[in-house]
A protein has these predicted regions:
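Residues lining hydrophobic/aromatic ligand-binding pockets adjacent to catalytic sites
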Residues: 1-199
């Protein structure tokens, strides 16, 4: 469930090469997302099984020996079960969790596809054929900037637009796209488009 910054990046560039052969990196958004709960921001992490430091992302298996699906879905229901649009969108996400894809890349691709469908967005996304060690001339490696340990304000991709959230009195920026979808429904796309940083 990518962050709002990730989606702002997709919208900003319109055409994106998604690295399908990179090496899996720990502590990135590749296996985590941030949602807003009654107790504040909660980071949901998909546990993975990887045997080497340079394991290709498409070979990274999800570790179902841990009860993460129950925890994730329980946290999502607790956070958004009473949100205005949960009844419309919740089942789309629940189906993916119930399918239990074997590989992290497949889980991420399914969740991204659902989010784009619900947002009615159609950026051009092509999967790379091989690991791209360098960025070609005229291109930007913008998606690599989207990282939980990097301050999004320095990336010039995402400019937060305040919207009504389920909890708290202060707006929390750059959460998972699920927060925006569940809280704003059809308005999510408009808010997201206004969140794109314009150079």
């Amino acid at each position: 469930l990518p962050s709002l910054e990730y989606f702002a990046c997709l919208l900003k560039y319109g055409e994106v090469a998604l690295e399908a052969h990179e090496h899996f990196l720990k502590q990135t958004y590749r296996n985590r997302c941030r949602i807003l709960t009654a107790n504040g921001v909660d980071t949901l992490i998909v546990p993975v099984i990887h045997s080497s430091i340079k394991m290709p992302i498409r070979e990274v298996k999800i570790d179902y020996s841990q009860s993460w699906v129950k925890r994730h879905w329980g946290a999502i229901v607790a956070a958004y079960g009473k949100a205005p649009y949960f009844e419309y969108f919740g089942s789309d996400f629940e189906r993916v969790y119930q399918k239990k894809p074997a590989f992290l890349f497949d889980l991420n691709w399914e969740l991204l596809t659902i989010c784009l469908k619900l947002l009615r967005l159609k950026p051009t996304i092509r999967l790379t054929d091989s690991y791209q060690t360098e960025v070609e001339e005229g291109q930007s490696d913008a998606l690599s900037l989207v990282h939980p340990k990097k301050e999004f304000r320095h990336n010039n991709l995402y400019l937060p637009v305040v919207y009504q959230q389920n909890f708290g009195t202060e707006f929390v920026s750059n959460l998972s796209i699920i927060d925006l979808l569940m809280c704003q429904g059809a308005e999510a796309t408009s808010i997201l488009k206004r969140s794109v940083f314009v150079d």
